[in-house]
Amino acid sequence: MKNWQHKFFVGLLCCTFLFFGWENQVLAAGITNYSTPIFPSQLAQLQVPQNVYDYLQQYQPETYNYLTEKLAASIEDAKEPLPDEVVNDLWALSPNNPRIKWRENNGKLEYLMSTWKYVSNPSTDWPIGAKKLLPYQTWFTAVPQVKEFCQQYQAVDSNNIPDHIELLLRLQQYLGLILNKYSTKTHFVEMWVKEEDLMRPCIDGEINDSSCNLLPVPVPDTNPVVKTIYTNSYTNAKKEYYPWSGLGYTYDWGNPEKPHQGPSEFIINPTPEKPVEVEVVSVTPTQEYCQNNVEQ
């Protein structure tokens, strides 16, 4: 980890990380000119918010403005997916994939999936071992893709921002989430999800391959799920848009390298009338989930 001592904060995006657990990526662009230094003596006296949005608004407004501009550019870029952004290394959900976890339960294949959520009461909201009915669309990644990423992530050694805030920001970028006051996520919830209930949110929704076809824009009516996701990403009443390209991976707007590939993404698409049953495996606070506890 680099020691910047008392220089200006060089950027929430300026970090060395291992992408998909394979190899080092280049350093992201710094944002030195947009940060206000906060020294340890000051930071110790502050009531630091646990939400990235609140922290940046209160203590780093110029950095927040820079990041919102970067996010806006990412949204425009993702809106029109290009052929060279199609990848062939998506994580496949298949017993033949050694990277994922699966089981056969009552004659049906199930995969261990993870979702990042706000959880106010883990023991009652997501009791471990319980079967839970989900009546709403939920986005997942396959365990352990995000866990590997965040355990390998190293925060910038800076006096200007708490490490836990920086980690939360990097996860929001990696998962293609935006900066707003409602974006607080507290826990990673892992659960067994039936194969038959999962799909990729792309024009060809198969989960057992490693690529998605290029998303046609406008999205055809023949794929109403994907069309709704695309519409909600770029036109909604709140005018809070998301960088989503429908190519099977999240748009990582913290990664400067095209195609800005984040983890492979999957969804379930139940309704209140027809919920999806899952089995809760673990509910882990974000900081704990991302600790790299190397076994001796």
Predicted regions and their residues:
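Bacterial N-terminal signal peptides that target proteins for export
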Residues: K2-G11
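Bacterial N-terminal signal peptides
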Residues: G11-G21
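Boundary at the C-terminal end of the N-terminal hydrophobic targeting segment
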Residues: V26-A29
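ADP-ribose/NAD+-binding catalytic cleft of ART/PARP-like enzymes
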Residues: I31-T141
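Solvent-exposed loop/turn segments at secondary-structure junctions
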Residues: Y118, Q145-E148, E196-M199
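Short His-Asn-centered micro-motif
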Residues: F140-P144, W192-K194
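Short active-site loop/helix that positions an aromatic residue
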Residues: P144-L168
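Conserved NAD+-utilizing ADP-ribose enzyme module
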Residues: Q172-Q296
